Regions:
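Peripheral peptide segments
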Residues: 1-154
Length: 154
């Protein structure tokens, strides 16, 4: 079974700490604790992983982000990626080739990811049972430290 991990971006970005940073690869842009922990989890358990951004859509680690932004799924914003553009990226970035997508985000991502899935695909949300970011951070840390993946949750 071919799997990919999708991790959330995060509100805190490199330009919030270093305004002079200029353009940066996506894997260096996002600084929030949840993003850092999900990235560590993705790098530990998956050979393929992407970041999902409400502005840029699906990002590979080496894709360049040029400037700060404040756009989130679930909050209307003129700069939010359209469903059509996200669907196009889903195909262009070959996410259709995966059988299982492991989404390390909260329930708001179901509305974004699930409509993109093809019949052969399943989306797993291992953080869904956790009530709050603190519990999510703890679970992710323990999973990485023990090298045991979080149980699947559909």
């Amino acid at each position: 079974m071919k799997r990919v991990c999708i991790i959330p971006c995060g509100a805190k970005k490199i330009w919030d700490v270093h305004p002079e940073a200029g353009s940066q690869p996506a894997n260096l842009v996002y600084l929030s604790p949840l993003h850092q922990r999900t990235k560590s989890y993705a790098q530990t358990f998956f050979s393929d992983w992407l970041i999902i951004s409400a502005k840029h859509g699906f990002l590979k680690a080496d894709e360049i982000i040029h400037e700060n932004y404040d756009v989130a799924f679930g909050t209307p914003h003129a700069d939010q990626i359209t469903r059509e553009a996200l669907r196009q990226q889903f195909h262009e970035k070959h996410l259709t080739a995966y059988d299982e997508l492991v989404i390390l985000g909260g329930k708001k991502y179901r509305k974004v990811i699930d409509p993109l899935l093809l019949p052969h695909q399943t989306a797993i949300y291992p953080l869904a049972p956790y009530k709050g970011i603190g519990y999510m951070l703890q679970a992710l840390k323990q999973a990485v430290e023990t090298k045991v993946e979080l149980p699947p949750h559909i």
